[in-house]
Amino acid sequence: RCRRQRQMCIRDRYEPVGYKTYADSDAFSNGIEAQIPVEGSIARGWEPYDYPDTNEGYESAKTTLISPIEDIDANKVNGKELYGIYCAVCHGNKGDGQGILMTREKFLGVPSYADREITPGSIYHVLMYGKNAMGSHAGQVNAKERWQIAQHVMELRNKLIK
């Protein structure tokens, strides 16, 4: 059997009811379709980050935040690629603060990774929130990618301080 509705044929399948998000409904006690998420629930694709966007949060991340990703080639390759996309224009391919925007004097004072004490946790925190003239990259890269970039930045730093 076939039901015709708007020139569409649905054979032997359930035809779902399309609810409007804010429509009235007797399915819930408050009478509306859209419900407030259960306390403690986490949105899909979002990961909690317990360090605040403060100097104290930065220092805490610097000393206590540890990378959960493995030190394997796949992470290194992806970290290097992401660094080239998001970081090298300011920080340079070597991490010396001499990226294309710096050499063209679009920004001044981009730090070299050898200039200060950084850790994977502090790098992750800066990617999450931004710092000084650098904006947050949390919207561009997910948590795993931030850790991969942090891993690559630490490799660059180690080469610079040798």
Where are these regions (language model features)?
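Single conserved hydrophobic/aromatic residue that forms the stacking wall/gate
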Residues: 1-10
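Post-signal peptide N-terminal segment of mature Sec-exported envelope proteins
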Residues: 11-30
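Electrostatic cytochrome c docking/interface patches
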Residues: 35-82, 158
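Soluble non-cytosolic domains of exported or imported proteins
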Residues: 73, 77, 117, 140-144
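Gly/Gly-Pro-rich "capping" loops immediately C-terminal to redox-active cysteine motifs
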Residues: 76, 80-81, 92, 96-125
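The canonical Cys-X-X-Cys-His
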Residues: 79-94, 149-153
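C-terminal capping alpha-helices of c-type cytochrome domains
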Residues: 121, 125-133, 138-162
